[in-house]
């Protein structure tokens, strides 16, 4: 079955993303404290917003807006608000829950604030020694540095092509990769370096890497690159280290824009990419510090042990709502919207692909999911926005734990649907989908030679 899924380069990349998502949802059990103590109770569905059913934001325990909530076994926190801040539903909003992968919204917010949506991750190639262009040989080492969380097969082949255009086809030396370099979602710099070396050499290149290269070049209509087979043979070994003194920068590869990397990350809830970006921000405690400082979130409302949502983390629904609103504001400052980074239910591939798929619901929910099957006895979340036929957009946070995650998801969908129906029913957001493979095949991502810093010279 896998060979069918990876018949195209981009499909292969997205399969990796999906696989990482599926594996990442499992986490070790934890008996951590700070678990909420409220259990959901039975309530009848509402007919709409009225004075008799208006939420009471002061009632944080129990059902402040009972009509939107249905019976469920487990713990639940809910906060739904209109854009102007009116409370639609509130339950246990100051209790702490495990948000699972919804914590990626916090990582995303701080990344956008720190780097900006146009930011590109750089992967640089350095060399030592001399180049003999008469026989295409570099006598010296090739060094690769960078922390691009989206670096894959096709990017390595692209760099091989650029070296070929500089007259290099053989490296009589070692491949040195920086400790922070990773490729194909592999945390090990050593393994990533070995994959890079094999992908560089056409004779050792895997079928997956070959398809990745062909499909991406086809996707961006770069037929010229397909007329030859890029290849660089490295005769030495893979070593881990920094660029040595005297190394000369030769090429720099630019990733897709951060906003496009985030869209893929969040659609597939890719834990590896979230942790890599989190590392570049200083780790979970650095992200938490920004939330406390800039968003004025009470430090007692958030506990972060990861930037992906793996493990034991704690957020209150109130804190998560502040993050969601800040994320919308940050995007709007850059003329973007939540649909530019989050999955649109029933349309985008990934975690919301099979939810809200009814023709009347499709495209009416934009949200981040979260799932941990074992941690905290099972944790599930849904955080985002919904649109209704009344024209209202409602922001919502639903956090569940200590129960069956499948039932939690069904309950979350029921809450969203009930709120939408109370406002005339669901309505789709304006959204023009772009294939995720195209987002990662940004044509501006070409390797650029370092002008004025290196001139090939004969040995």
Go through each PLM region and give its residues.
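Small-residue-rich helix-loop
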Residues: 88-90, 281-459
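Beta-lactamase-like hydrolase cores
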Residues: 27-96, 159-165
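Short, well-structured active-site flanking segments
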Residues: 113-128, 334-339
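Active-site-adjacent, His/Asp/Glu-enriched structural segments that form or flank metal-binding
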Residues: 121-195
